[in-house]
């Protein structure tokens, strides 16, 4: 029983760190936020923060992974409810993006701040950074485009479009 209580505390602490760090990154910019500032914002010692994250980069990726997982799960849940045409997949993508922004405006602000790092480090699914930051089963880099590409040539979109180019253009611009 005490072990379960400790695990719940760790999970709550982890979530608190992610929320506080993301808020700081959005308010001040990634470069201007130190590990000490994150610890202070959470009311914890720096050593405690290091228990959860070995460095700032790992913390940034954890925030990103959590946000992407939340967004990806919402997309997949809507697609599992019933089969979607390619046009409906585009609609679902943009509806979920708008919904996420409405529920959590910092969601897109963090992605905007993190975009340069994200694109550089995840351009290839098999890269060392990608493998370290995304766990098997995570909604990761490129999965949004793959979501849109499914059923792409079902006739609901103009014929002759390149599926990958169209999906990437829609999701990353």
Language-model segments: what does each one mean?
Residues 1-28, 32-41, 58-61:
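Basic, helix-initiating cap at the start of DNA-binding domains
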Residues 13, 56, 63, 67, ...:
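Hydrophobic/aromatic residues within well-ordered alpha-helical segments
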Residues 21, 42-53:
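Short hydrophobic/aromatic patch on the recognition helix
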Residues 27-30, 51, 158:
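Helix-turn-helix/winged-helix DNA-binding modules
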Residues 62, 66, 76-106, 163, ...:
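Hydrophobic alpha-helical connector segments
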Residues 69-72, 76, 121-154, 164-168:
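Amphipathic alpha-helical packing segments from all-alpha helical-bundle domains
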Residues 100-128:
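Amphipathic alpha-helical segments used for helix-helix packing
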Residues 108, 112, 152-173:
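Hydrophobic/aromatic-rich alpha-helical bundle segments in the mid-to-C-terminal region
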């Amino acid at each position: 029983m005490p072990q379960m209580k400790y695990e719940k505390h760790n999970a709550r602490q982890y979530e608190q760190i992610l929320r506080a760090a993301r808020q700081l990154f959005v308010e001040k910019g990634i470069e201007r936020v130190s590990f000490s500032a994150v610890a202070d914002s959470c009311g914890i010692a720096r050593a405690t923060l290091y228990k959860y994250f070995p460095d700032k980069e790992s913390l940034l990726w954890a925030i990103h992974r959590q946000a992407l997982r939340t967004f990806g799960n919402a997309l997949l849940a809507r697609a599992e409810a019933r089969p979607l045409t390619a046009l409906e997949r585009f609609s679902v993508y943009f509806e979920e993006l708008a919904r996420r922004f409405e529920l959590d405006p910092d969601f897109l602000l963090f992605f905007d701040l993190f975009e340069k790092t994200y694109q550089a480090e995840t351009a290839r699914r098999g890269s060392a950074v990608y493998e370290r930051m995304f766990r098997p089963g995570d909604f990761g880099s490129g999965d949004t485009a793959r979501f849109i590409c499914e059923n792409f040539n079902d006739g609901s979109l103009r014929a002759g479009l390149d599926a990958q180019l169209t999906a990437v253009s829609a999701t990353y611009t």
